[in-house]
């Protein structure tokens, strides 16, 4: 699958999800992850769609794959925190929530000029 084909598939899945066609979105994201197993975006999207449907086991499996690809990513750590909270594991939820906060702080330290003016 070419990068353009993957992007089109990903955009179609996003559109399907926005139109409340979750099964179609999940099928397209499954095709994307099968074709390009190192696609962080596809795994993260698969985790989020499954989470929204309360398919927590599938959401966790997809989120774990995305996390393995980008363990420092703010958004996947936030997703994992939300999944673990829904599963009732507060300690793991707090762990991933803390990782997300640490990542955000590191990003702020890398770009102090963007923080100088505060929120506008």
Protein language model regions, located:
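Structural signature of tandem alpha-helical TPR/SEL1-like repeats
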Residues: 18-28, 53-65, 87-99
